[in-house]
UniProtKB/Swiss-Prot annotation:
Coiled coil: 61-118
Source organism of this protein record: Bombyx mori
Its job: Component of the eukaryotic translation initiation factor 3 (eIF-3) complex, which is involved in protein synthesis of a specialized repertoire of mRNAs and, together with other initiation factors, stimulates binding of mRNA and methionyl-tRNAi to the 40S ribosome. The eIF-3 complex specifically targets and initiates translation of a subset of mRNAs involved in cell proliferation.
Region of interest (Disordered), residue spans: 1-94
Name of the protein in its database record: Eukaryotic translation initiation factor 3 subunit J
Bias type Basic and acidic residues, positions: 66-89
Family: Belongs to the eIF-3 subunit J family.
A single BP term in Gene Ontology: formation of cytoplasmic translation initiation complex
Protein biosynthesis listed as a keyword: yes
Amino acid sequence: MDVSWDADNFEPKLPTTLAASNKWEGEDEDDNVKESWEDEEEEKKDEEKTEAAPPPQPKPKKKIHDKIAERERQEREKAERLVTEKTAEEMTPEQKLAEKLRQQKLQEESDLRLAMETFGVTEGNIGKLDNFHPTTKEEYTEFADLLTKKITFYKAKDEFPGFIDDLVKNILVQMSSADIRRIKLTVDNLYIEKQKAEKNDKTKKATKGKGKAKLKLEGDNAHLNQYESYGNFDDDYDDFI
C-alpha cells in the first residue's frame, strides 16, 4: 500500500549502512599501524633485556665422595671423643694420676722448648756444642759461653747447686794442684765480691727504682763478669776446695 508523503504520521527511514565514526577514511588504519609499531618496539626491548641478563650461576655442589669423607670424619671425631670420655670414667685413681703426670710432662716439655727459644738455646746450638772441639783461646771462650748458657738454663731447679758441686769436683780432680790453687783464688775472690753485693742488696732492698747490686771483678778475673747474667753461683764453693 503506498504511503502518502502528505500523511501526518509519515517518518522517513534513515539508511542503516551509515557509519557512526567521525574519522576520515583511512584514519583508523593509521592508528592500527602505529600501535603495531609500538608493540614491536616494546617486544624488542623486552628481548634485549632478556638477552643482557646473565643466567643465575648454580651453587657449587659437593661431590658425593667429599660428602662421604666429611661425614666419616665427623663420625670418627665423635667416636674418639666418646671413647676418651668413657676411658676417663673407667680409669682407676692410679691411672688418672698417671695420665695427669703424662699431661704435666708434655706441658713441661712445651714450656722448656719455649724457654730455650727465649734464652737463645736452640737445637742448633746444642748440636754445635756436641760437635765443638776448641783449639784456640777464642774458641775456648766461645765454648765456655755455650756451656754456661746450657748449664745455667737449669739454675732454678732445686738440684742445681748439688749438680754444680759434683760437676766442679769431677773436673778439678783431673787437674793439677797448681791449677786448683789458682781456681781456688778465683772462687775466693768471687765469694768475697758476692758477699759484698748481697749485703748491699739487703740495705737497698727497700729503696724503689734501684736495681740489685752487682759485683764487678777486675784484673785476671774480669772475664767472669760476662757470666753474671746467666745466674748466681752457690756460696758453698769453698766447701769442696
